[in-house]
Amino acid sequence: GKLQLTIGETAVVAPSDAEVVVRVEASPINPSDLGLLLGMADVGNAQTVGEHHVEADVPEKILPALKARFDEAMPVGNEGAGVVVAAGGSAEAQTLLGKTVGVLGGAMYSEYRTLHTSQCLVMNEGVTPRESASCFVNPLTALGMVETMRREGFSALIHTAAASNLGQMLQKICIADGVDLVNIVRKPEQVQLLRDIGATPVSYTHL
């Protein structure tokens, strides 16, 4: 089997009353995006086919697990940010016109996205799309980790990817909420990175 990765063109849908059109200016690549973008293909042997097309082989033994993806176009990009350039007729939509917004809407590796106003988080004046592009996936994951800990009756967390963007967010949340957090990192310089934002303890593990 083959994974096909392409850049395509789609029409920009005119916004309904409660929708806006966002000109996307930044979008992160999260692990969840990579899973959808590349699946389990052998990207080390990927081949460029034409100007906007890449193909990579998918091992036969993996194909049954990917059956739902066969012959399906799957737009990528969970979150991003940009500027609202068109708005529907509702007061809420009109209020967003010209504003920088963070967006959770899927298919964010696009130039333009038409989205419901409820999918947009308005940024303060001066905050750039680049600074806004990761305001959903990692923050909600970090908050979810703390909430899950509490619901399951625990009072502390151990995090083994502590120096990541997610890990740094989790550290700040745990300090604010009074949650004990043990941070595990894989590079000595990452110890100081976390201590600079208040982490204690930090464990360095060489694998």
In which residue ranges do the predicted regions lie?
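N-terminal Rossmann-fold cofactor-binding loop
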Residues: 184-187
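Short alpha-helix immediately C-terminal to the canonical SAM-binding loop
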Residues: 191
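NAD(P)H dinucleotide-binding glycine-rich loop of Rossmann-like/cofactor-binding domains
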Residues: 55-81, 85, 100-161
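Glycine-rich beta-strand-centered segment in the early N-terminal region that forms part
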Residues: 11-28, 40-105
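Rossmann-fold NAD(P)-dependent oxidoreductase module
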Residues: 169-173
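Conserved small/polar residues in nucleotide/adenosyl-binding loops
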Residues: 205-206
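Conserved S-adenosyl-L-methionine
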Residues: 176-180
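Glycine-rich NAD(P) Rossmann-fold beta1-alpha1 loop
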Residues: 161-168
